[in-house]
Amino acid sequence: MLAIIALLAAILLPVIPHATSRPRLEAYAVDVASLLTLDRNTAIRRHAQIRTQIDAPSRLIASGATGRQVRLPDDVVVSTMVAARCGDRPSGGTITFFASGMSCGGVIALARPGGGFQVRVNWLTGGVEVVAIVP
């Protein structure tokens, strides 16, 4: 009997969908925030502009400083709100950090049924924060 239960478990467990849990979603948001903070700090240290690339349809965020990428699972909906123009050029799905620490700002929302998180970049200070989305 125990062998039959083990066999059924081995067959059925891979079929059960593995949705992203709320704690895992929060961990992804913190990971995105740390990537953005790294890009901001690198812009200050190098005295140069650094652009963080955001590809919402592909659920991919890439550091302009290191090339490190955060790829989000298929069940996470990624949406962004960034400035249409940043400085003298179209933003093109990026958040730009300047040598002063300032940025063009933006919000990256990571959501799934039941809630989510926003990673907010302040345009004036370039500071990054993670805020829970209350359903």
Question: At which residue positions do the language-model features occur?
Answer:
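N-terminal helix-rich module
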Residues: 7, 11-45, 49-135
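Residues within membrane-spanning alpha-helices of integral membrane proteins
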Residues: 3-4
